[in-house]
């Protein structure tokens, strides 16, 4: 499981949980036999640890009233409190033998901004974007063709490792959600170069490590043959494709067509929903068809769920927990009666009937990137377009 930095109702948003609530959550992970989790609450609190002579915790506490939307990262708590909570969570996770991947490389994103003090002092060169998303300087990616920028990114990783530990597993998003050239081939070459540069530098710093390569950008911006070409340039002994988009609505661009099956290590995963979508949803027939492919493939190394909110659809969490270890005998049809009995007790059969009667509608709620209008594929949900065809 992974826990994200969106903000909203307390139940759904891990950034708002206390240490005691995190203890309860990590114990729940063990109960459900999950063995890995990712904490995605931003990296601003790592900068004072990585660059103590430049950045301090107090800088991030005031926020910036001139920035709005994604650019406004006004903290819910102080950065120092966040850092202390991160340390407590990592310690509890280690005590429970949970794997914790560590971010590396071009990690700047909407939820992980560069402090203004670092920009003013270090003056990193940035990659120029052709899209406006995250275009504020604090959200731009440093140009890692410059050795100094790459080394500084890895100073953040080292600070995390030194303060919170690591299990030999690292993670990169590459240049996800961004375009840097109007020329598709030029844009692709830059993205491929970035993956190579990160993996090669990581190999030097942590020789025995593994690198999870996030699939988010593949699902939205890459063509199948482009993903396949990237695999030719990555080391399968080091890299694992971290595909948390296996349930996408898109039948053309998904792991089955990337040439990973039977060829390159990958993890099968369910994204399930964008942050605003907190209801029952999902096309389980689509998931189970693709899951069968992964379950029969020795190159598939695991199962992950990467929802943008933490406890939106409780059935999907139970479904993931069951199928991650045994993808036989745990189909939606087989699991639903057990789930309803455990969750609803005497009302189990009534809720089972409700779930089944609503399924023809809830199965239409499937996330998916808009490949035809790539710049518009964030937080769009095409469910209503599908439902309108039935009316």
Regions found by a protein language model. Name each.
Residues 8-9, 35-65, 71-355, 359:
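Catalytic-core regions of glycoside hydrolase
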Residues 20, 25, 31, 145, ...:
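Enriched - but not universal
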Residues 359-391:
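C-terminal functional modules
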